């Protein structure tokens, strides 16, 4: 009768169990590096917005207080464990308010609304997709950074 001899399965099982126990930490470390890289690229795209001193009809540029509010409000959200999808998530978004008070926003215009108005355009603003364009341009590189970080974390665990 034929027989099969397997060598090394106990070690493989032990390594897989170790990796499963550390998977959350590995994912968070990789996501942290990817989010940090993407936040730097999105900040650079925000810094590259052209500024004008006063509002012109149908301009693509932003006012100085708008750009300042966007730069001050760009943040990486707290990491969240999504148990339903079995993953770790974060987002890069705008928080805070501008110093410019309006009738609708006496405490200042929210930075997220400014960003949305710049990206989508309004009756007095030509749309400028600075944020989605920067994200799409750098998405693959951020994914590669996360893969490399995950691989290096796995190598540390297996040593």
Each predicted region: which residue ranges?
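Short helix/strand-capping connector loops at secondary-structure junctions
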Residues: 119-136
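Short, low-complexity, charged/polar segments at coil/turn and helix-coil boundaries
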Residues: 17, 21-122, 152, 158-159
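Prokaryotic Sec-type signal peptides and long signal-anchor helices
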Residues: 13, 41, 83, 134-135, ...
């Amino acid at each position: 009768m034929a027989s099969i001899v397997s060598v090394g399965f106990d070690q493989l099982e032990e390594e897989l169990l170790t990796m499963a126990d550390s998977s959350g930490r590995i994912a968070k470390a990789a996501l942290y590096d990817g989010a940090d890289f993407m936040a730097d690229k999105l900040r650079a795209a925000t810094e590259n917005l052209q500024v004008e001193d006063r509002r012109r009809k149908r301009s693509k540029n932003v006012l100085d207080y708008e750009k300042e509010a966007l730069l001050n409000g760009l943040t990486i959200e707290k990491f969240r464990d999504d148990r339903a999808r079995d993953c770790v998530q974060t987002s890069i978004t705008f928080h805070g308010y501008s110093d410019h008070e309006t009738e609708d926003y006496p405490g200042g215009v929210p930075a997220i609304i400014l960003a949305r108005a710049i990206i989508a355009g309004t009756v007095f603003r030509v749309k400028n997709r600075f944020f989605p364009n920067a994200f799409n341009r750098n998405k693959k590189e951020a994914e590669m950074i996360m893969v490399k970080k995950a691989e290096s974390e796995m190598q540390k665990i297996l040593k």
